[in-house]
Structures are given as structure tokens and as C-alpha cells.
Amino acid sequence: MAKKREKARKWFAHRGINPDNTLTNPEDRQFYKLDFPPIPVEYENAPSLQCQIDIISFLFYSHVTVLFNDPSGQEWEYEGGAGGLGVGDISGEGILTYGDLDTLTKATTFEVSFISADGGGTQVSWGSSGNAFAAGVGEGFGVFGGSGGWKKVG
């Protein structure tokens, strides 16, 4: 998790955000740099694919990555940052559902919630574009909303 935490710090630094600030000063509150989430939906007859979810939390910020292979074998990675409240990290394998691959991979805003104490679960939602659920290992809890983007890997 140390490498993932360092990757998360670099992601926030690139956007001018210090994820370790305490928000005691109003100018430290940089949530306006992150978009906020859509509402999750359920899909009928949606494809279900295996995915990997990693969440690194910094009290008021979190860094989220989701990896999966589409039906053609192409690997995709979503990477984003969010504002909210939580502590700890979680990493887990789960299921990704979506209605349309093109719609999912164009989604930017998301919400994430997780709870873990030597096991637990997480949900990442792109609203009507897709949802990912995982059981994982780590310790912590959190609820965040933010934005990011998809890219093809490899």
C-alpha cells in the first residue's frame, strides 16, 4: 500500500491539492477542485466483469483506482480523487457492472464508500454509467465524491 499511497499523493499534487491538510483554514478547503457524484442505479441484464478496486484515504480526500478487462480483453483503469471524510486504505477484487462500455469509459464523476477492518467492502459508482463492488482487505472507512477519468492500459 505504500506505493499506492505515494501514487495517490502525486495525483493530488499534480492538481494543487495537499491531501494531508487539516482544513483548519478556509483557504485549505479545496473541494471545489473536485466534482461531486451522480446517484448509483441498478442495471438489468448488465455485464458483470471482475475488477480490482484500490482506495487510499487522507482524512478529507481519497484516491481511487479501478482496473478491469472488457469482454474483448482490453484492460481499463479509472483513476480519480474525491473530497469527503474517511481514513485508511482498502484493496479488493470485485464485480463491475455497466449498461454500455462506451458510456462507462466516458464517465468522470463518481462516489465511493467503504468500510473495512481486516476485511470489508467498498462501492464505486459512476451513477447511470456503472457500479463496482468489492470485498477487500485493509482498515478504515469513508464516503467521498469526486472526479477522474478512464484510460486504456497496455
State what each model feature region is.
Residues 2-154:
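A membrane-pore/channel beta-structure motif
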